[in-house]
Amino acid sequence: MKVLILGGFLGSGKTTLLLQLARYLVDSSGSGSAYKVVILENEVGREGIDDKLLRGNGFDVENLFNGCACCTLAGELVSAAYEIEKQYTPDWLIVETTGLAYPGLIQDNLAAGIGMESRVCTVVDVSRWKRLLNAMRELFV
């Protein structure tokens, strides 16, 4: 199973990119056979919004509610990824983080917890880039 972690601030376009990417993987894998995709949504609150949109588009979605997968829900993240791999046997797992998450920590937790390799893609709203850079310089590499 390949794992992609999508990070970015609230409103950066993570869900829009996720939806387009998942559609591409399912519809046109290039080899004529579709990839199986499962999405793991992380929400700080008790209920999700994006999971309903993604399910409405025909995707299998699992949720991590009420915390952040990089810290307070790190153990639940590892368990969820392991269970998703066993239950669904997907080709791709796409993890959409909260807008506050550190995607690199999620990547580290998956590697340390179950030896799962992943890639990180950070989504940025270019119209807000300069403001974000100035306000949160210490977060950027």
What are these language model-derived features?
Residues 2-7, 12, 16-139:
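Nucleotide-state-sensitive switch-loop elements of NTP-binding domains
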